[in-house]
């Protein structure tokens, strides 16, 4: 569930004039305090939108039944009104009525493994090195780049991002470094060490399943240079050549309850506990991966996507991870690189902004060779593996192997056009792509489905996401008409434009805090908190259908030619992520092999055809030039 963001225009901090007089530490707080609070939408408005969103995806009988339940729910003096008042009270008392609830329900209480089910991966452009020297040089430069970005976080001088002229909440940037998820028996927690009395000065480096603590600052507080980091990485590489080590990191890929039990067993031992604490506190992790088996160029991208998302299995690089760590950069000897991140801390856009910065940084030449001062040996993190822990590792390996075999992932570069074409037609590129997805899905399945697209709520203090529902009556009318020979081309163009505009309108409402999904979730959680019986509208078939997202999608734009990916959120669904570049579009599509009805490559094929057909339709009927 990643965050949609229209390309945020970054302007410098300057909308609150007295900043030049303030200490840096109060700058971020002043910006955050000036942001509006997330509103609770009017009850009737959300319920009307809910009923409207159900029309394309449920039968007329189901819809009529739900309409009755909605009318009862919102009756004067009824349960809906009481819950709405409770939510409004919560909004007055908290900084954001949703953020804590969302963190818990979407992430910390979610018991499936973070791998595939929750943590997104990112594939960066293949680098031009093909050997160990190149791998370590690039990793060193990347580390230096992240530390350079960290200066802006530490000094609170990150340029504020704007969306449609409105400043955005920058809090997520302050959660992604020196943080880690910690498993718990029913609910996990996230520990952030960046604001402690002694903030961490080390990163974690993993090679051949062996973890190292690498200090990246000198005693005077200055960061190590890329040359110095390179020397340290060489030391790490040379002292971890054994390949018979137990992949302790694979424990973090297991079901959260199983991992919580194994975690408690693991940290009973002081040596293990100290090693785990070092990983949790580190600023971020760098995984020096073994090269994946060679494959043909067209399969290469999808293989690397798997490597970034899950490591490729216990025989390859899955043991080279600590999946609870918020940020893990991955660099392999063959030039493939990317990252995987734990989702509780942030959505895609802040991660991608950091990546854009770091990738630009890695292209800078080293102007001066830095002096090679003697540096201490990086500390190897030891683990005492008891038979019980070994058994936990074996179980985690088996579970991960099943998950990896079940994942069907395809990365497609759509070369025919990028955001340039929809823009030339005065259409939103995001809405255009979403309508192509609706068309592709309809052509395969002959029906519309509940579709989730992430909308950023960062216009509000501590805002995370809400849902843009891409399946509408407008989109359904368009996709039905597209292959109907009785509908004229001119009518099809009008229906396409109308569907795109409707999606654009929904997006605008969602980022202003007026979508209904999080509001309904809030009402449901309020009912649980008030210990009242669950209202019928939440026990209804229509609600179950509406929340079963066969298409879970996200636009994550970047300046870098990269793509993000994640697994489907339902067993019979798809995960679709895309980065629209100027003249091409990067897509990732995922499904599960255990579902006979879904196939990622087939959806990719139909999506490509839908995009081309929509372009041909618009080109055959040029807009009248005003």
UniProtKB/Swiss-Prot annotation:
Gene that encodes it: CRAT
Catalyzed reactions: (R)-carnitine + acetyl-CoA = O-acetyl-(R)-carnitine + CoA; propanoyl-CoA + (R)-carnitine = O-propanoyl-(R)-carnitine + CoA; butanoyl-CoA + (R)-carnitine = O-butanoyl-(R)-carnitine + CoA; hexanoyl-CoA + (R)-carnitine = O-hexanoyl-(R)-carnitine + CoA
Chain's role: Catalyzes the reversible transfer of acyl groups from carnitine to coenzyme A (CoA) and regulates the acyl-CoA/CoA ratio. Also plays a crucial role in the transport of fatty acids for beta-oxidation. Responsible for the synthesis of short- and branched-chain acylcarnitines. Active towards some branched-chain amino acid oxidation pathway (BCAAO) intermediates. Trans-2-enoyl-CoAs and 2-methylacyl-CoAs are poor substrates.
Chief location: endoplasmic reticulum
Variant or mutagenesis effect after changing residue 465 to A: Increases the KM for carnitine almost 70-fold and reduces enzyme activity 450-fold
Localization terms from the record: Endoplasmic reticulum; Peroxisome; Mitochondrion inner membrane
Disease (UniProt): Neurodegeneration with brain iron accumulation 8: A neurodegenerative disorder associated with iron accumulation, primarily in the basal ganglia. Disease onset is in early childhood. Clinical features include speech delay, progressive cerebellar ataxia, unbalanced gait, and loss of ambulation. NBIA8 transmission pattern is consistent with autosomal recessive inheritance.
Distribution of this protein across tissues and organs: Mostly in skeletal muscle, less in heart, liver and pancreas, only weakly detectable in brain, placenta, lung and kidney.
Record membrane topology: Peripheral membrane protein
Keywords: Acetylation, Acyltransferase, Endoplasmic reticulum, Fatty acid metabolism, Lipid metabolism, Membrane, Mitochondrion, Mitochondrion inner membrane, Neurodegeneration, Peroxisome, Transferase, Transport
Protein name: Carnitine O-acetyltransferase
Record-listed N6-succinyllysine modification sites: 93, 261
Enzymatic class: transferase
Residues at which (R)-carnitine binds: 452, 454, 465
Organism lineage string: Eukaryota, Metazoa, Chordata, Craniata, Vertebrata
GO cellular component: cytosol; endoplasmic reticulum; mitochondrial inner membrane; mitochondrion; peroxisomal matrix; peroxisome
Top-level taxon: Eukaryota
InterPro entries, alphabetized: Carn_acyl_trans, CAT-like_dom_sf, Cho/carn_acyl_trans, Cho/carn_acyl_trans_2
Residues noted as binding CoA in the record, renumbered to the chain: 419, 423-430, 456, 504, 555
Similarity section: Belongs to the carnitine/choline acetyltransferase family.
């Amino acid at each position: 569930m990643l965050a949609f963001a229209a390309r945020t225009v970054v302007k410098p901090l300057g909308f609150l004039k007295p900043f030049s007089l303030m200490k840096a530490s109060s700058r971020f707080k002043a910006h955050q305090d000036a942001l509006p609070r997330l509103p609770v939408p009017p009850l009737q408005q959300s319920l009307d939108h809910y009923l409207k969103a159900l029309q394309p995806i449920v039968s007329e009988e189901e819809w009529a039944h739900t309409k009755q339940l909605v009318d009862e729910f919102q009756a004067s003096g009824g349960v809906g009104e009481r819950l709405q008042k409770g939510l409004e009270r919560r909004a007055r008392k908290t900084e954001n009525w949703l953020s804590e609830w969302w963190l818990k329900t979407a992430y910390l209480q979610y018991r499936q493994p973070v791998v595939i089910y929750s943590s997104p991966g990112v594939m960066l452009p293949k680098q031009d090195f093909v050997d160990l020297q190149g791998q370590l040089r690039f990793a060193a430069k990347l580390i230096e780049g992240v530390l350079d970005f960290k200066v802006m976080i530490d000094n609170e001088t990150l340029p504020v991002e704007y969306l449609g002229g409105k400043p955005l909440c920058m809090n997520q940037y302050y959660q992604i470094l020196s943080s880690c998820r910690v498993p718990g028996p029913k609910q996990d927690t996230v520990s952030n060490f960046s604001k402690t009395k002694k903030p961490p000065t080390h990163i974690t480096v993993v090679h051949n399943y062996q973890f190292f603590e690498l200090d990246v600052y000198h005693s005077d507080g200055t960061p190590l240079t890329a040359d110095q980091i390179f020397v340290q990485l060489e030391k790490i590489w040379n002292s971890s050549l054994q390949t018979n080590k137990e992949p302790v990191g694979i424990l973090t890929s297991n079901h959260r309850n199983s991992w919580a039990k194994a975690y408690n067993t693991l940290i009973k031992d002081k040596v293990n506990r100290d090693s785990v604490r070092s990983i949790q506190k580190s600023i971020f992790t760098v995984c020096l991966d073994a090269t994946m088996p060679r494959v043909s160029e067209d399969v290469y991208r999808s293989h690397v996507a798997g490597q970034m998302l899950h490591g490729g299995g216990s025989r390859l690089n899955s043991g080279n991870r600590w999946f609870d760590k918020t940020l893990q950069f991955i660099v392999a000897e063959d030039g493939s690189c990317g990252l995987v991140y734990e989702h509780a801390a942030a959505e895609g856009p802040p991660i991608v902004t950091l990546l854009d910065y770091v990738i630009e940084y890695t292209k800078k030449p080293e102007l001066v060779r830095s002096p090679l001062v003697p540096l201490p040996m990086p500390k190897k993190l030891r683990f005492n593996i008891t038979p019980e822990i070994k058994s936990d590792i074996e179980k985690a390996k088996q579970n991960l192997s099943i998950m990896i075999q079940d994942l069907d992932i395809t990365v497609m570069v759509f070369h025919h056009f990028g955001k340039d074409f929809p823009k030339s037609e005065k259409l939103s590129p995001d809405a255009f792509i979403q309508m192509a997805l609706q068309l592709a899905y309809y052509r395969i399945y002959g029906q519309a489905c509940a579709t989730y697209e992430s909308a950023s709520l960062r216009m509000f203090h501590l805002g995370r996401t809400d849902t843009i529902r891409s399946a509408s009556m407008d989109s359904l009318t368009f996709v039905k008409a597209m292959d109907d020979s009785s509908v004229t081309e001119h009518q099809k163009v009008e229906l396409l434009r109308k569907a795109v505009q409707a999606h654009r309108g929904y997006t605008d409402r969602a980022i202003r805090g007026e979508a209904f999904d999080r509001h309904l979730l809030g009402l449901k959680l309020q009912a649980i908190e008030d210990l009242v019986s669950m209202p019928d509208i939440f026990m209804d078939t229509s609600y179950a259908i509406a929340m079963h997202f066969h298409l879970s999608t996200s636009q994550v734009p970047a300046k870098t030619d990269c793509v993000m990916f994640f697994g489907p959120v339902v067993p019979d669904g798809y995960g679709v992520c895309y980065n629209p570049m100027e003249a091409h579009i990067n897509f990732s599509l995922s499904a599960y092999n255990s579902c006979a009805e879904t196939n990622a490559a087939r959806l990719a094929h139909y999506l490509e055809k839908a995009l081309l057909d929509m372009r041909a339709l618009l080109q055959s009927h040029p807009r009248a030039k005003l």
